Amino acid sequence: MNESQIHRGEICLIMATRGRPEFLTEVFAALKSTTAQPDKVSLWLYVDEDDAITRKAIDSSALNDAGVKVNWHIGPNTSGLCETQHTLWRNSGKTAEIFMILADDICFMTSGWDDIIRDTSKKFPNGIFLACPYDPTSADTCTYPIFGRRWLETLQYIFPGHFPYWWDDRWVHQIGEMAGCYVRLPIDLRPIRGKGKTRRMRDLPFWARFFQLTLDERKDSAKKIIEAMNLTPEEKSAALKNLEQHATELEKQQEKFSDLYTIFQEERFTLHTPEERRAFNPGYFKKEADAVALMIQFAQWRMAEKKFADAIKFLDATFMSNIRLRQAIDLKVQCLRELGKNSEADKLAKETLAAWPEMNFFRRIFRFLGMVATEGKTMIIGFLQSGKKPK
């Protein structure tokens, strides 16, 4: 983006909403009463095309008065919030100096919140920073992230797109801390009806483990952020040292993983009944399939480096999903043999054959018959063609 195209001091608010225009009315009222410079704030909202309730409210002009410029985007349902947020970011033209992600049930309580953000931005003249207001429901996570524009330009995403729910905010939070450009702001946000339930939440143990095992991706992103800061050699060295220290602490947390605790969290926070969570959902399935594929890819990279014990961690994570892949089990069998655990490998291999019978005897017969049929067909065609008389 050309520097001359950037609107200095402008804040772009990005929000997805569904089926609760009465909440938006309160959000808009709070925004109108607390914004110091409304001419420098824009609000972009994503509405699902099948959300008849919200669309009716828009058409009736019931949602016109937010005190700032409001931009609506009507689009298809997505498998995660990330897709809606990226759509709004692109549609905004990316010309704001600051971007903030909001929910449709959160109200600003701090007057002049926008000036607080602008003052923070001035402390990062390179435009690379991550900030977060106070969130009483999740004090240890960057729930409503505020991005300097060059942060987004550097990484080319708001969130990575891996997750159907949760984790995105924690993802960028860890990047910000590792890169040393994360700040908390004295801005108070309050949920309208207290902390609500989470849509799309299912299989939390798998997603929690997936998040832990993708730390290397976040480290790479933090390194990109540091590289883009144009630091002196001494500053860069200190920043990379800070990154490794934070990463080491995060790696220690991986060893404390508890699937029982994540099951408790799922039952506590999910919006859906057990029956709803077991129902097939194409969008969710694609997210999970992509995540499983990534875990297998990471395992293969470790195997190429002869790090078989590490590879098993990634393969075991796939077994926590709803998707069972024979390739993942075969790779684990290979890792176990490389580690000298042949009895365990043999047991797993037998279980694999029970689930996916190879039927080798029949396959050999069919291969032979197929070869005979192919060769016979070739001979017959050749014989017939050789017997034709030229015209």
What residue spans do the PLM features occupy?
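Short, acidic, metal-binding catalytic loop of nucleotide-sugar glycosyltransferases
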Residues: 26-40
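A conserved acidic beta->alpha catalytic loop
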Residues: 45-59, 107
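A short, glycine-/small-residue-rich helix N-cap motif at loop->alpha-helix starts
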Residues: 76-84, 89, 165-166
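Active-site nucleotide-sugar/metal-binding loop of Leloir-type enzymes
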Residues: 86-98
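Short beta-strand-to-loop acidic/aromatic patch adjacent to the donor-nucleotide binding site
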Residues: 96-107
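Conserved donor NDP-sugar-binding/catalytic core segment of glycosyltransferases
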Residues: 106-144, 150, 181-184
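C-terminal catalytic/acceptor-binding lobe
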Residues: 166, 170-279, 292-293
